[in-house]
């Protein structure tokens, strides 16, 4: 395994560890109620039974297992992609995405829902609560998009021809 791959795997492990440490700490800290931090930011206690930002909420006993199964399959695909990539930016992005997805899978399988505690708001609009795993996943996908947009810059779009041939 190359150093670049260890970097991506390390990013995934770090995200999972930080996510799993932060969630119980925040659950305990927020037991007395939500905390106003700034005019645009609160710490809240919210359980999400769906995927990111409460999309695809699946209630019932099978919901967490279905969503977790999908997240695990996607994470396996992302891990294969990580092992096939040799550039730092996509490998870190993939590691962050994998760590974020698996951090939420752990919550979903152990609690039946994902604990969210970060909430931004402005002008009466409250962005759905999220957690460190969601943040890592979003940043990871953002890095993949940036890599996809700029990866070909500076390279010739036409195949090189040997000297003397046209």
Locate predicted features.
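Alpha-helical transmembrane bundles and membrane-interface segments of multipass inner-membrane proteins
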Residues: 1-166
